[in-house]
Every structure is written in C-alpha cells, then in structure tokens.
C-alpha cells in the first residue's frame, strides 16, 4: 500500500508542479494553504473585535489655582538670596536659575509673587498637579527669602470598576507607595503603558487628601465584556471545499483575573471543518504576554477537477508566541515579537497519502504602532526560519522568508474615514512547498477574485477603503468603496498581478445583528472561467448582547 501511495504521489506531482509554474493553480487541494486562508479570516475578525483604547488624559487632577497677581508698589528691598525646600521634580540648578533672575535686584511683594509663579509654571509644564510653590509669611531679614515647595504625598490608593480583573494585577503595574511624594509623570507613564498593552483600561483620578499636601489616588477601571460570542454565515469559504460556510467566534476575558484571553474560532462548510483555540496571558509587569494556540482542519474536495478523485486532507498546527513592549508612550508602541510553530499537513487521494509534510517555523519580528485621536498606523515585519520535511519522499528543506503586515486608519472630515491593510512575503528560495506559498484572491486579499486565485513564493497585497458613515440617514449603516491590488512571484510566470475595485457596506440595524456585503470587479483575467465580479456577504449575530 505504501508503494502504491508513492506511485500515485509521483503521478500527481507533474500536475501540481505544472500548475505551480503556470501560477494558475487548480482548485486548492492542500489543507495547509486552506488553513492559512482561514487564519487570515480569523485574524481580520479579531482585528475588528479589538477593544478600543481609552482616549483623553491618563491622569486627571484638580485644576491648578490661577497665579496670584499682586499690584506692584509698597516697600522694596534688595533680594540677596532665595532658598527652596527640597524638590523631587525640579533640580537645585533649575531652581537657582529661576532665582537668579531676581537676586541682586530691588524687589517688592509683587516681584516675589512673580518668582513663585515661575516655579509653579515649571510644575504645570511637567504635569505635576500635586505640587505647588508658595510664599510663606516671613520678614526677609537681610534680603533672604524662603520659597516653600509642597509636593503632594500619596495618602491612599483606591480601585473601582473592576469586576473580573484582580486589584492586585492592576496595582502591580500602577503601584505607588503611600506617604511618599506622588510622582505624577511616572504615574502617567505607568497608566499609559498599562492601557496600551491591556484590554482593561485605567483612568487615574487625583483628589485632595484629608490634609494639605496629601493626595488620594483613585484608579477607575473600564473592562471589556467577560464573554464575547459571534455566530456568522457567509460565502467566504474556499471554492473547492464549499463557499457557503458557518462559524463562530468566542472570547472569554479575565479567566484568571489578569487580562488573560481565551478565544475559539471555528468554521464549517460542506467540505471543510477548521478550528482554532488560543490562550494569551500577561507574564510580567511591563506588558509582556505569552500565547499558545492549536489549529486543526479537515477538508474534502467537493468541486473542481479533483472532485472525482476523492481528495481529502488534514492539517494541524501548535504554536507558542511571545510579545514584549520595548517603548510605550501616548503616541507610540514598539514591541518585539517571537514565535515558534510546528505544523503537519497531509493530502490523500482515495485514502492514499500523496503528500505528507511537517514543518518547524521560528519567527522573530517587531511591531511599531503610531496612533492619535484621528489616526492609527501599525507596521509589523518578521523574519522566519523554516525547516520543512517531506515524510513520503524523505526530503528536508531549510529556507527563510521575510513576512509582514501593515494597517492604517485615518478619520477624515464629513463622516469619512480611510483604511489601508496589507501583507507581504519574500522568499530567497524558489518553488516553496505548497503550504508555505503566499496566496492572493478572496475576501481578505483581492476581492474581485475567488479565494487563492494565485500563489507564489513571494508576494504582497493591499486593500484601500474609503468609508462614509451613513448613520445620520440609516442607523448603523457604513458604506465604502475599495481598491485591492496584489502580486505573487515565482518561476513561471515570474509575476501574476491581481487588481480589483468595488463597493461594500456594513449595516447594523440593531447592536446584535450585522449585515456585510461587497462586490469586487476584477481588472484582468488570470484564471480560467473567471467571473465578471465576485460577491462576498456575511451575516453576524451576537446573542449575548440581547442579555
């Protein structure tokens, strides 16, 4: 039986190789590449479900009192020296520089108040709302003046609004010891770092304590839903295994009370069953997160030229990933990423294995996000080292690829917004294994073509959408026009280009229900029997929003 499988595998090899050279492949029979397309759809859905980050100031404190203005006049004296209380936020050299503008001059009470105002201006510029400079009662004997610096000390810290998130988890990242001077800039940095690296969001509120010079810190917590469930039906499946499919997405937040996330994504069509389970958990106080995932799929070819050959396949992948933020502020997030994946893929013709492969993939990369109130841009390049094994013929290949993804969104006037998404792969080797090819065509890449219309060793695609929020006319309606483009590169032909344009909409008449549709028009013919347009639609239901 093993010899028969080998003979049949060699017999089919010329067909698949010829198709690969032509870059007009027959309907996909590789479960690995079908799994990658499903993974794209999962990633796109998870991107849409990302919890919005908190806008506005991370720390809110009482308004600083207006500077006291005292009319000039009255007794004047020669200011010989100014002394200050110790400060945690202003260096002695900076204080001396302020005082130098006044020392050695004739001055009155109004001039002294100007000196105090200069110090308070420094506090204000540095966001230190819990500190104040004052001029205490004194005689100014010998031209010596003392300026009192009161820098608020933390009296107590409270946490409110956390239902599924542990108080200890929050204070581990935003923790300031009581009875010490409250470092407001550090508090702001800690809150921003936490918010940019967690779904849970914090707003720090500063309030006067029971005595002058004491400050209470209240951490107001905003949490995502504990459970998120989406059930959907669409025609975005792979044509060879059935375009009509149903699926669900489930997310459980805060299982351990530490912003951990358990997710499941599954789809089912006539010839395809695929599921992905993942768990992601923070492992340090600086936003580092460790994730594990398992994906398994089974296919049966129900359409296309291989339908009569009883083609089936299966694939699975286990992966571990780690992300560690390196630099975080209100406008930037730079994160190092690492991952390891082990995958297995097998294709059978009439229950005889014709391909059976496994791979080990090591990935290292970086993601950079720049964001503001009206825009967000993310670029995430990565380097991959892959060891691929052919378990039937016994071959081993080692090769490297450079991959990446990018997305951007910009709010425009008149209820308009612009979004861009893209991905790429570059491989130095040629004729990569089928489950490592870069494919384009379909609802997540170039919408004017069927899924996996073309594939190659290297490639790219991008989507550009101009949206118009029509909610003022019809509640929950968003319309857009789009332009998609992509290319794949291999040996023959060296390049296959796909371009399309079209229109789409998303309509949520009520919060639990969303209808999505798009029509893409291809700009050129690249596959046989190519349709004049591609329609993709989806209906999504969120039952938990009814509760």
Residue ranges and their predicted role:
Residues 23-237, 265-274, 400-402, 422:
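Periplasmic polypeptide-binding modules associated with outer-membrane biogenesis and secretion
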Residues 199, 224-226, 255-257, 284-286, ...:
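Outer-membrane beta-barrel channels and translocator barrels
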Residues 213, 242-246, 271-275, 314-318, ...:
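Residues that define the transmembrane beta-barrel architecture of outer-membrane proteins
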Residues 227-237, 248-252, 258-270, 275-277, ...:
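Transmembrane beta-strand segments that form the barrel wall of outer-membrane beta-barrel proteins
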Residues 229-231, 260-264, 288-292, 320, ...:
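Transmembrane beta-strands of outer-membrane beta-barrel proteins
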Residues 250, 505-507, 512, 531-547:
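Outer-membrane beta-barrel "beta-signal"
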Residues 294-318, 324-325, 329, 343-349, ...:
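Outer-membrane beta-barrel translocator/channel fold
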Residues 346-485, 489-491, 525, 537-542, ...:
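C-terminal outer-membrane beta-barrel translocator/porin domains of Gram-negative envelope proteins
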């Amino acid at each position: 039986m093993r010899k028969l499988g080998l003979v049949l595998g060699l017999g089919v090899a010329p067909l698949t190789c010829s198709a690969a050279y032509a870059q007009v492949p027959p309907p996909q029979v590789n479960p690995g590449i079908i799994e990658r397309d499903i993974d794209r759809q999962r990633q796109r859905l998870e991107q849409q479900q990302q919890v919005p980050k908190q806008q506005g100031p991370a720390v809110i404190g009482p308004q600083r009192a207006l500077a006291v203005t005292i009319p000039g006049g009255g007794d004047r004296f020669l200011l010989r020296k100014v002394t200050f209380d110790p400060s945690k936020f202003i260096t002695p050299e900076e204080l001396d520089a302020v005082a130098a503008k006044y020392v050695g001059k004739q001055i009155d009470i109004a001039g002294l108040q100007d000196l105090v105002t200069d110090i308070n201006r420094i506090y204000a510029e540095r966001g230190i709302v819990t500190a104040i400079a004052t001029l205490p009662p004194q005689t100014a004997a010998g031209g010596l003046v003392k300026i009192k610096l009161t820098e608020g000390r933390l009296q107590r810290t409270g946490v409110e609004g956390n239902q599924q998130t542990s108080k200890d988890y929050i204070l581990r990242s935003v923790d300031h010891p009581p009875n010490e001077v409250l470092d407001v800039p550090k508090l702001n940095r800690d809150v921003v770092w936490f918010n940019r690296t967690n779904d849970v969001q914090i707003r720090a509120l500063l309030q006067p304590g029971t005595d002058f010079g004491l400050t209470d810190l209240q951490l107001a917590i905003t949490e995502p839903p504990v459970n998120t469930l989406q059930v959907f039906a669409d025609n975005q499946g792979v044509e060879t295994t059935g375009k009509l499919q149903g699926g669900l997405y489930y997310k459980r937040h805060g299982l351990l009370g530490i912003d951990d996330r358990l997710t499941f994504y599954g789809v089912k069509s006539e010839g395809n069953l695929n599921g992905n389970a993942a768990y992601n958990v923070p492992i340090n106080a600086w936003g580092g997160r460790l994730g594990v995932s398992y994906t398994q799929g089974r296919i049966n070819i129900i359409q296309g030229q291989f339908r009569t050959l009883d083609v089936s396949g299966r694939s699975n992948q286990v992966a571990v990933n780690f992300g560690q933020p390196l630099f975080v502020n209100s406008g930037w997030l730079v994160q190092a990423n690492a991952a390891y994946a082990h995958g297995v893929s097998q294709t059978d013709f009439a229950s005889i294995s014709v391909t059976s492969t496994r791979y080990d993939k090591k990935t290292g990369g970086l993601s950079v996000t720049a964001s503001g109130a009206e825009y967000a841009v993310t670029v995430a390049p990565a380097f991959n080292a892959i060891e691929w094994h052919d378990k039937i013929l016994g071959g081993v290949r080692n090769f490297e690829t450079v991959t990446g993804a990018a997305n951007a969104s910009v709010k425009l006037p008149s209820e308009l917004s612009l979004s861009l998404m893209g991905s790429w792969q570059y491989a130095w080797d040629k004729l990569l294994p089928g489950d490592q090819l870069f494919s384009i065509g379909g609802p997540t890449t170039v919408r004017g073509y069927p899924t996996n219309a073309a594939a190659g060793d290297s490639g790219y695609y991008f989507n550009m959408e101009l949206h118009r929020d029509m909610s003022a006319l019809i509640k929950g309606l968003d319309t857009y026009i789009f332009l998609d483009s992509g290319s794949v590169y291999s040996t023959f032909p060296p390049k296959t280009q796909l371009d399309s344009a079209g229109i789409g909409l998303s309509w949520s008449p009520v919060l639990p229900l969303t209808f999505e549709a798009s029509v893409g028009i291809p700009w050129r013919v690249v596959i046989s029997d190519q349709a004049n347009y591609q329609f993709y639609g989806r209906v999504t239901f969120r039952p938990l929003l009814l509760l």
